[in-house]
Design a protein with these regions (language model features):
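Bacterial N-terminal signal peptides that target proteins for export
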Residues: 1-7
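Cleavable N-terminal signal peptides
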Residues: 8-9, 19
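Sec/Tat signal peptide C-region and signal peptidase I cleavage site
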Residues: 15-21
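N-terminal secretory/targeting leader peptides
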Residues: 21-113, 123-343
Length: 343
């Protein structure tokens, strides 16, 4: 089914029923006009309006307009705001399993991550961690593999990671710390100045088209690949549970349909624009590089250690980690048989 067909089916259900529209203010962790990430919230808002026949609309606010970007979860939990738009991995400090659900280092491709989350039991596990906070989790937007980041120093050996000051989100930060780096999480609006002034040596954020909007190519020398830390990543709509429970089951299902349609949009919208943007960066003097195999091997080994350590500390993390490993194991034979060698 196409996205329009999915949404149309939900809209037909709502047709002919006069209801009072409800508008939810949504605090985003991203700038409202940011390509792909901010854009995704607007696509979701349109899809929800169509699917519910106008019964529910979203009014999206950019990062910092309602609450600071990294306070969105606590604000939704408390009821200060009804809903938020986020990268799931931002909340790993409060919800350990969110680090894994947001992005797994050396983890699944986008299609397999979507499969695990929506059909492989992933969402049911992760939701259990959100329940004590009174928050409904709706993973509505998946990001394709990201670059490894922007650097102002070359990474030729594992030793070059020692003392590296890097902004990185999710579990990737813990992996780099294990190899001697010093990492921190900063919101998008602070990254340019931090990199320009040398407070950090490197940063990652998202896809090339998103990074372009943040101006990194103006101040960083090297653009490294691959994005080992986020082969795929999840962004979500989070809704205060009292607000969510205030919707009838029919409307909840329509919102879920709109959410899944937005996942389809995110998978379709990501691949094509990136190559042209990378060429723009090269024309500006940025050097694109791949991490050496030695460095990737060390990052993979450290990632496995971190994943196992986190699983030992948190039962829900352990449950999710076992679940995703089982899902990938079952899919491995199929995917390996279907893989076509590159020329």
């Amino acid at each position: 089914l196409t996205c329009k067909a999915l949404l149309g089916a939900a809209a037909i259900i709502a047709a002919g029923v006069q209801v009072q529209a409800e508008t939810l203010d949504v605090a985003s962790t991203f700038p409202k006009n940011m390509p792909f990430l901010g854009e995704g919230a607007e696509v979701l808002a349109k899809n929800i309006e169509i699917a519910t026949g106008g019964e529910v609309t979203l009014r999206v606010h950019g990062a910092g307009d309602l609450v600071p970007a990294l306070e969105v979860l606590t604000s939704v939990s408390s009821g200060a705001i009804p809903a938020g738009w986020d990268f799931i991995g931002y909340w790993g400090g409060t919800i350990p399993v969110a680090s894994l659900a947001g992005a797994m280092p050396f983890g699944p491709s986008p299609d397999l991550f979507v499969g695990w989350m929506w059909e492989g039991g992933g969402l049911e596990i992760v939701q259990k961690a959100y329940d004590p906070l009174g928050v409904k989790l709706l993973p509505c937007h998946v990001t394709a593999p990201e670059p490894g980041g922007w650097f102002n120093k070359e990474i030729n050996t594992v030793a070059d990671l020692e003392g590296l000051k890097m902004r990185i989100s999710g579990m990737g930060g813990k992996v780099l710390n294990k190899l001697g780096a010093s990492t921190q999480l900063l919101p998008a609006g602070e990254l340019y100045v931090a990199l320009e002034r040398g407070r950090i040596d490197a940063t990652e954020f998202s896809l090339p088209v998103v990074d372009k909007s943040l101006g990194f190519a103006e101040i960083a020398k090297y653009y490294y690949f691959p994005g080992w830390h986020q082969p795929a990543s999840w962004n979500s709509l989070i809704v205060n549970m009292d607000v969510w429970n205030g919707f009838g089951e029919e409307v909840q299902n329509q919102i879920l349909t709109a959410c899944k349609a937005t996942v389809a949009w995110s998978m379709a919208a990501a691949p094509e624009p990136q190559g042209a943007v990378i060429e723009e960066f090269r024309a500006m003097g940025v050097e694109t590089k791949r991490f050496p195999d030695e460095v990737l091997a060390a990052l993979r080994a450290a990632s496995k250690e971190v994943l196992e350590e986190e699983a030992a500390k948190d039962p829900l993390f352990a449950e999710a980690y076992a679940s995703i490993q089982d899902y990938l194991s079952k899919a491995q034979d199929w995917t390996s048989l279907q893989t076509i060698p590159s020329e």
